[in-house]
């Protein structure tokens, strides 16, 4: 099998909705969260995730949710994304407990934390993403009668451009501390775009601000994902998504960048570290996945 060229389906000004290109990966992750919610002993329950899948009409994800797997291999990616979801949930809970009242979810996708988490009074949650993605989420949650548990503000913007101005125009206060999440975004950015993203976040972050990042230390290699499915037949990584063609090879280390730009960075953890902290024993398939993805979960403060 020949590995597709990395980023071959991308361009500097490409766009997408929730069922195409990078947007579909948000739907895929929502599917994994929905599967994790119905698995034994879930770390988190995102009951909105299944509504996004139903509304999308995607045949692959609809079929998977209709007949969820039960083996360790079948639950591998739902389990790993359950761990990731818990990490970011805990981050925002801790930020709120510390008195931070501005949360910014970068590349919000189908994130439902504004509706799921128990936010302190007077908290504003800013969700930054492309307009088509935000419109889909608002429509689906509106049809469900969902009510956010904080003041939720949509910021329609391309994260490869200057999104800081739309954020400030939406009411973001640069003089007040903020909590930022960058979840599942970095593989889809070039190195230059990643630097620009962190530069803008740093420029908007008052003293006392915090950031949480989920990153990968290696590229999303098509051959490795295929080999994983061959060696663990229950694993179904992505349906027909070609991650190699949608992502770029990582060059910069986010933790090193933050440390060099005025952030105090906590010890970096991987998925296996998080699982241990949640009292879980990672199955062999999880160890293998993290062996080639080299996950990084980063928290830092100013």
UniProtKB/Swiss-Prot annotation:
NCBIfam families in the cross-refs: mthyl_TIGR00027
PANTHER family: S-ADENOSYL-L-METHIONINE-DEPENDENT METHYLTRANSFERASE YKTD-RELATED, S-ADENOSYL-L-METHIONINE-DEPENDENT METHYLTRANSFERASES SUPERFAMILY PROTEIN
Gene Ontology MF: a single term: methyltransferase activity
Protein name according to UniProt: Putative S-adenosyl-L-methionine-dependent methyltransferase MAV_2803
Binding residues annotated for S-adenosyl-L-methionine, in chain numbering: 129, 158-159
InterPro entries given in the database record: Ppm1/Ppm2/Tcmp, SAM-dependent_MTases_sf, SAM_mthyl_Trfase_ML2640-like
E.C. code: 2.1.1.-
GO biological process: methylation
